[in-house]
From Swiss-Prot:
Induction: Expression of the botcinic acid clusters genes is coregulated by BCG1 during both in vitro and in planta growth. This is Oxidoreductase BOA1. Pathway: Polyketide biosynthesis. Belongs to the NmrA-type oxidoreductase family. Isoflavone reductase subfamily. It comes from Botryotinia fuckeliana (strain B05.10). Its EC number is 1.3.1.-. Signal peptide: none annotated.
Length: 300
């Protein structure tokens, strides 16, 4: 048994991790939040501890007071302010007497330095991993590919906010991603949470922990969508001109989306093991992704 603190537990991915923690009895946990969040605490029957992410010494004190062994960060990192909060959380954990393990807020693909340089939000997350490497803390980044939630909403419950990026389900259209033939990994946040919690019992962590809900090419995904809806979906191949896209996708198509297409093509989302990494599916064969191979049945 270890005591866990989930930072950002009221957000999308963090909420899914909290759900998984609530479903087990081996580990105790608290949720760290900038506010006391009484409604969230009552609804989920969890202990919420308010924390000031600008105060490293206070962070260390809170973690020690609650005898926290493992910190799981699920903070939303989209600005330097958010990134600084996570950096301070790392430093506070490193300065704590009780904390031994840390999970940075990654939950995506196996990004490298080139990705961090190309996409600001990826770079903002990467600094936490660099900071962790300087500490005595054992850490792992969870690599789960794309969130399958976006293909199953609203039929399958999710704590993620709905948004159009690659799909426009009502109009039966999809943005074209590269050649569409390269396999990519997709995992539902519910399953991410289950594997994250299972990993708490591992005697040793690798620096990267891979989770595979399903692996399909983008063409396969579009074909599945067409079979389910009974309509052929045209794939709208990205071009340098936003005028080539349907209206619903013009706002979605951006430099970020083009980068995703380039990264799809290079295999960034294929979740290929590298040195210092492990497939959690192999370590926990009893965990069968709820929305892996059967996700098409839940496509809305």
């Amino acid at each position: 048994m270890v005591r866990v603190a989930v930072a950002g537990g009221t957000g999308g991915v963090g909420y899914a991790i909290v759900d998984a923690l609530k479903a087990q009895t081996e580990h105790e946990f608290i949720v760290l939040s900038r506010t006391e969040s009484p409604e969230y605490a009552a609804k989920n029957n969890v202990k919420v501890v308010s924390i000031d992410y600008s105060d490293v010494s206070q962070i260390s004190k809170i973690l020690d007071e609650h005898h926290i062994h493992t910190v799981i960060s699920a903070l939303c990192i989209v600005s330097k302010e958010h990134s600084d909060s996570q950096l301070n959380l790392v430093r506070g954990a490193a300065g704590s007497q009780s904390v031994k393990r840390f999970v940075p807020s990654e939950y995506g693909s196996a990004y490298e330095e080139k990705h961090a340089l190309a996409r600001p939000s990826t770079g903002l997350k990467a600094v936490a991993v660099k900071e962790l490497a300087k500490t005595h803390l054992e850490y792992t980044s969870f690599v789960n590919g794309l969130f399958l939630d976006y293909l199953c909403m609203p039929t399958v419950p999710s704590h993620l906010a709905a948004g159009i990026r690659f799909f426009d389900i009502p109009s039966r259209t999809s943005v074209g991603i590269g050649s569409g033939t390269v396999p990519l990994v997709m995992t539902h946040t519910r399953d991410v949470g289950r594997f994250v919690v299972a990993s708490l019992s591992l005697p040793k962590w690798e620096n990267r922990s891979f989770i595979v809900g399903d692996r399909q090419s983008w063409h396969d995904v579009i074909n599945i969508a067409g079979k389910i809806t009974g309509e052929k979906w045209p794939s709208l191949r990205p071009s340098k001109s936003s005028g080539s896209h349907e209206p619903a996708h013009r706002a979605a198509y951006s430099a970020s989306l083009k980068e995703h297409g380039d990264w799809f093509e290079s295999g960034t989302f294929s979740s290929t093991l590298s040195s210092g990494s492990v497939y959690l599916n192999e370590l926990f064969p009893e965990i069968i992704p709820s929305y892996g191979r059967r996700w098409p049945q839940d496509f809305d």
